Every structure is written in structure tokens, then in C-alpha cells.
């Protein structure tokens, strides 16, 4: 499938032992929020380790369009924020490119302001559902103009005075939770979010760090109630962004699968809401050693030493899905080389990611000789530990559907399979992991971009 003039295929080939020590780019979730909260806070915020992928930069541009001053000195991003309640009406539509996180969180942040703000994005983002964020904003008094099915472009206009709400999040979505809390920042009174299934909690931790009056209670059933007092003061902070666990997954799984590998990955975010993949791989028999666990900016961080391992199939508990929703594509690749079947359930959220990620993974696996079954919300992969016959000798390419995680996952597969694996486009890897190709090559991975851009 062509993605227009700028797509560029890539091919990965069987590689021998990967080795080295690498530092992963900063966490995407924390990077988005660093720009947003720094832009909103009073005074100066300084950020090191920021993920400089296109998605995060688009969030920074949106904050600049609403009055924040952002500059870079050396490795440090310096933000002069507008003060809570001080965002200015953007003069042009806010373009978030491929970034659902930046788009949905900013809708919450600015939607309750008494002016018009318009949100646009690329072809992939324009297909994704925004109603999950727009519905609670409507309850707070926000007027919404959107395309059919609550898709982009979307224009929001807040009321003179927003209404605080108590909102029970209907699906496991940190973006919905965060959007409501961010809307609550500029709403008088207490905004309450009830979360039946815990999702990544960076918004809560970081807002507390910036000085918001925010409390979290968890009941006996694990239901979390988050209360935020609106219109309080946020104060600029110093943030060192830890390495993204979702990006860590690619060199980590490659090191587990390529025989003779020994790779150390530094400064990885180990927040318990994000470590579902590591836990699952350990259950499969992965040799992952957690070194030097420490706290940095209120978050758990550690270094990981990963050695090639013999994996066995497992059934992944459904309730683990929120803590590893972005990691199922690379888990499916690991499962393709495990002994026996790996069963993954509760995958409905994968159908509304950058692509229908579930069918994209299943189709890519089948194209490369893997025995798998795709259900409505499940995937079963039966592995072949020696990789015999896997890959695609004819060079047929996996359709990535503009999805960076599909591209990286299948390039990892090609490092282990008997035949090469080709993806139809690797350009969008830059949205989350611009250094991927160089970092993997430095460890000894054989991945080549095609010389010709696809038409």
C-alpha cells in the first residue's frame, strides 16, 4: 500500500548476537505532558531527556500558539508558561499530525476556555474517535463542532463558566481521564474522575508535582477516585524525562530473540502502569535483569540487562491490557518465536489505534509465515522457536498503515526469522522513536532502508 510520495520501505535480515549499552529516547506520555504543564504553569520549566519526535513537537507548537514561550538551549528545553487560566486563543487551527495524545489532552486543556479552538491532524488521526473526550467536555458546557462520528476537524468553544463534573471513565483510557482533569484545571470547584480500571497515571503524578491540589483514593475493588480542585496555581518545574518503556520494547525483544545477545538499556521508566510487557516476557522465560532501580521525578526508573532467552507461550491476563496496550504488536512478534501458543485477550482498544492494530499485526504475521488466529478482541500466536520458514522470501511487504509500532515490530521480527521481513514504510517511525534505525544498527541489527522512495 502506498502512502504517497514520501513512504520508504525497509527490510530486516537475520542478525547475530546483539550487544551494547543504549539509552532510549524520553517517554512520549511524559514528554507531551511536560510541554503542556510547563506551558500552563507560572514561571520557568526546564526539561531534559524530552522525546523530540514529531508528535511531541506538535504539542509544543500548540502550546506556543496559545501563548507559552518555548526555546531550546543545548539539551534543555526551557518554557515560560502563561499561568493557569492564562491560555490565549490560537489564531490558526492546532495541527497535531499523528498524535492522538497531544490532540485529546489539549482538547481538555483549552476546550473549557471561552474562545474558539480548532483541532486538525493527519489522515490517520482524522479517522480516530474523539467522542470519548468530547462527551465529558459537553457535560462541562463546551460547545463542539465536529465531523460525523466526532472526528477531526473539531472546533471547541467553552462556556463563560465551566461546570465541574463527576465523570466515570467508560473505557480504560488515560487520555480520557487526563482530558477531564485538564479541563478541571480551569473550572471552578472540584472535578472528579472515577476510573474502574487503572491506566497510566502520569497526569496525576505530574499535576501534583506542578502544585495542583489533586487527590487519589483507591477502594477495595481497585476503583480509583481522582479529585482536582480547579483554578489553583501551577508552578514551573525541572523535569528529566525517563526512557519510554514502549520504545524500550523493540531493542529489548530483539535482544531476547537474537541468539547470543546481551544488551543493557539505561534509564527506563518502570511505572507499574507501564510494565505489563516486561512482566509478560518474564512469565515467558525472558532473562531481564532490573539494575539500579531508583526514583526520578516521582517516577520509578531502572536500567535493564537483557540476554537472549528461550521463550514459552503464555496466556496474558486480560486485565493487563491497559498497562501494555501499545506493546501487543511486539509481544506478538516475541510469541512467534516462543514454544507453544500465546493467547492475548481484551484487545478491543487496538482496533482504534493509529491503525486497526489488531488486524495489521495478524495480517503481518500471516504474510511472514506465522500460525495465528485473530478474534474480535483476541489474538492467538503459535510460535516456532527456530524461526524456520518465517519471514517472506519473496519480499512481500507488511502493510504498516502509517503505524510506527507495526513498522518497528516487524523489523525486529526480521532479525530472527529465516527469511527477511520487509515493511512498506518506515518513515513514520520518527513520530515516536527517531533514533530507532541508528540505535538498532549500533547493537548489530541488520536493517536497511530502501534506496528508492515508494511512489
Swiss-Prot record:
Pathway where it operates: Metabolic intermediate biosynthesis; chorismate biosynthesis; chorismate from D-erythrose 4-phosphate and phosphoenolpyruvate: step 6/7
InterPro entries: Enolpyruvate_Tfrase_dom (IPR001986), Enolpyruvate_Tfrase_sf (IPR036968), EPSP_synthase (IPR006264), EPSP_synthase_CS (IPR023193), RNA3'P_cycl/enolpyr_Trfase_a/b (IPR013792)
GO biological process: amino acid biosynthetic process; aromatic amino acid family biosynthetic process; chorismate biosynthetic process; response to herbicide
EC assignment: 2.5.1.19
Chain positions covered by the region annotation Disordered: 1-25
Amino acid composition bias (Polar residues), ranges on this chain: 1-19
Gene Ontology CC entries for this record: cytoplasm
Gene3D superfamilies in alphabetical order: Enolpyruvate transferase domain
Acetylation among keywords: no
Subunit structure: Monomer.
Its job: Catalyzes the transfer of the enolpyruvyl moiety of phosphoenolpyruvate (PEP) to the 5-hydroxyl of shikimate-3-phosphate (S3P) to produce enolpyruvyl shikimate-3-phosphate and inorganic phosphate.
Name listed for the protein in its UniProt record: 3-phosphoshikimate 1-carboxyvinyltransferase
Amino acid at each position: 500500500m502506498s502512502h504517497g510520495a514520501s513512504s520508504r520501505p525497509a527490510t530486516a535480515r537475520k542478525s547475530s548476537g546483539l550487544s551494547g549499552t543504549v539509552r532510549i529516547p524520553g517517554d512520549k506520555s511524559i514528554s507531551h505532558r511536560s510541554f503542556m504543564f510547563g506551558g500552563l504553569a507560572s514561571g520557568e520549566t526546564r526539561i531534559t531527556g524530552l522525546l523530540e519526535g514529531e508528535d511531541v513537537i506538535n504539542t509544543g507548537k500548540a502550546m506556543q500558539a496559545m501563548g507559552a514561550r518555548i526555546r531550546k538551549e543545548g539539551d534543555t528545553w526551557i518554557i515560560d508558561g502563561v499561568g493557569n487560566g492564562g491560555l490565549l486563543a490560537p489564531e490558526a487551527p492546532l495541527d497535531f499530525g499523528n498524535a492522538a495524545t497531544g490532540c485529546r489532552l489539549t482538547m481538555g486543556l483549552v476546550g473549557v476556555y471561552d474562545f474558539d479552538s480548532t483541532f486538525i491532524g493527519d489522515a490517520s488521526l482524522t479517522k480516530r474517535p474523539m467522542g470519548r473526550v468530547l462527551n465529558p467536555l459537553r457535560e462541562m458546557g463546551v460547545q463542539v463542532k465536529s465531523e460525523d462520528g466526532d472526528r477531526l476537524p473539531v472546533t471547541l468553544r467553552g462556556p463563560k463558566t465551566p461546570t465541574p463534573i463527576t465523570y466515570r471513565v467508560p473505557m480504560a483510557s488515560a487520555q480520557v481521564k487526563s482530558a477531564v482533569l485538564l479541563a478541571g484545571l480551569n473550572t471552578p470547584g472540584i472535578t472528579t474522575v472515577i476510573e474502574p480500571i487503572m491506566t497510566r497515571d502520569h497526569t496525576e503524578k505530574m499535576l501534583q508535582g506542578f502544585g495542583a491540589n489533586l487527590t487519589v483514593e483507591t477502594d477495595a475493588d481497585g476503583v480509583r477516585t481522582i479529585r482536582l480542585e480547579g483554578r489553583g496555581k501551577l508552578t514551573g518545574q525541572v523535569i528529566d524525562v525517563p526512557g519510554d518503556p514502549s520504545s524500550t520494547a523493540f531493542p529489548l525483544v530483539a535482544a531476547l530473540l537474537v541468539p547470543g545477545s546481551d544488551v543493557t538499556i539505561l534509564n527506563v521508566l518502570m511505572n507499574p502502569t507501564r510494565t505489563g510487557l516486561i512482566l509478560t516476557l518474564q512469565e515467558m522465560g525472558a532473562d531481564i535483569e532490573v539494575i539500579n532501580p531508583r526514583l526520578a521525578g516521582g517516577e520509578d526508573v531502572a536500567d535493564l540487562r537483557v540476554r537472549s532467552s528461550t521463550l514459552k507461550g503464555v496466556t496474558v491476563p486480560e486485565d493487563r491490557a491497559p498497562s501494555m496496550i501499545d506493546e501487543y504488536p511486539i509481544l506478538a512478534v516475541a510469541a512467534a518465536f516462543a514454544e507453544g501458543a500465546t493467547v492475548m485477550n481484551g484487545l478491543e482498544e487496538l482496533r482504534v489505534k493509529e491503525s486497526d492494530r489488531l488486524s495489521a499485526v495478524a495480517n503481518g504475521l500471516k504474510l511472514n509465515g506465522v500460525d495465528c488466529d485473530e478474534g474480535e478482541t483476541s489474538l492467538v500466536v503459535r510460535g516456532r522457536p527456530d524461526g524456520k520458514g518465517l519471514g517472506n522470501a519473496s519480499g512481500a511487504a507488511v502493510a504498516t498503515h502509517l503505524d510506527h509500532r507495526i513498522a518497528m515490530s516487524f523489523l525486529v521480527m526480521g532479525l530472527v526469522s529465516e527469511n527477511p521481513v520487509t515493511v512498506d514504510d518506515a518513515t513514520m517511525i520518527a513520530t515516536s522513536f527517531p533514533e530507532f534505525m541508528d540505535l538498532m544498527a549500533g547493537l548489530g541489527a541488520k536493517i536497511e532502508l530502501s534506496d528508492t522512495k515508494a511512489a
